[in-house]
């Protein structure tokens, strides 16, 4: 059991660590947080603070260890899931890394939807998703090209075999062979379309940011905006709808779950859209 004295000492050590961190003395900060953990090991912030220091030093193994411990103590730690996701991405564990970043994003949106961390997490999640897609897309493209070449070679061999069995080639046989090659080209062109970036549909994009929705909300006038963008507009420009000019109270903004689900479905099928504007 941690005594009150030990808890107070741990808090002072945490403050020492925070001061060292601000001065970019990450080694000293780690030492302070480590002492705090020794005195009071069940405080998640000590573990996430130390993990942040390890992250600054790019010691990703220790980042992962500290974040996992923090999550054991409190499962809804935005910072712990976020840094764990980054650590896993560094280990090329894209699937698990993306999963942790998505968890951090969901938690962040619930606790502080307009906070800086939500934007930061989204940016990292987008990069991770796009990077994962690039790797998969490159492999898929190579496989398609390899298969296409094999199919073309097989058709050409069949054409040569057919010609060897007859003394003279007919126009019909030549035309049939050409049509088979064209059909093959169409099939593989269609298969490659999945990985070809196109324009994102307008209804999935915010009229303010001109980017695909992340956290869409609908105004009383029926127009959907990105939550952070419309809140910033209401705060800095005025409490009115930027399109209809009708007055808006931030409390009247409602999550547009239908658009959010549509965006999720679109991104699931078109991962390249994480990096595209509208």
UniProtKB/Swiss-Prot annotation:
Keyword Coiled coil: yes
GO terms (BP aspect): protein ubiquitination; response to abscisic acid; response to salt stress; response to temperature stimulus
Domain of life where this protein originates: Eukaryota
Coiled coil feature spans: 143-194
Segments annotated as TPR repeats: 10-43, 45-77, 78-111
GO molecular function, one term: ubiquitin-protein transferase activity
Keywords linked to the UniProt accession: Coiled coil, Repeat, TPR repeat, Transferase, Ubl conjugation pathway
Enzymatic class: transferase
Pathway per the UniProt entry: Protein modification; protein ubiquitination
Catalysed reaction, written as an equation: S-ubiquitinyl-[E2 ubiquitin-conjugating enzyme]-L-cysteine + [acceptor protein]-L-lysine = [E2 ubiquitin-conjugating enzyme]-L-cysteine + N(6)-ubiquitinyl-[acceptor protein]-L-lysine
EC nos: 2.3.2.27
InterPro entries registered for this protein in UniProt: CHIP_RING-Ubox (IPR045202), TPR-like_helical_dom_sf (IPR011990), TPR_rpt (IPR019734), Ubox_domain (IPR003613), Znf_RING/FYVE/PHD (IPR013083)
Keyword Transferase: yes
Annotated signal peptide: none
PROSITE patterns: TPR_REGION (PS50293), U_BOX (PS51698)
Inducing or repressing factors: By abiotic stresses such as chilling, heat-shock and salts (selenate and NaCl).
Boundaries of every U-box domain copy: 199-273
Subunit-structure text: Interacts with HSC70-4, PP2AA1, PP2AA3 and PP2A5, as well as with UBC8, UBC9 and UBC10. Also interacts with the chloroplastic proteolytic subunits ClpP4, FtsH1 and FtsH2.
Function description: Has E3 ubiquitin-protein ligase activity and may target misfolded substrates towards proteasomal degradation. Regulates the activity of some serine/threonine-protein phosphatases by E3 ubiquitin-protein ligase activity. Required for responses to biotic and abiotic stresses such as auxin, abscisic acid (ABA), low and high temperature and darkness, probably through the activation of serine/threonine-protein phosphatase and the subsequent modification of the plasma membrane composition. Regulates the chloroplastic Clp proteolytic activity in response to stresses.
Domains: entry comment: The U-box domain is required for the ubiquitin protein ligase activity.
Name of this protein: E3 ubiquitin-protein ligase CHIP
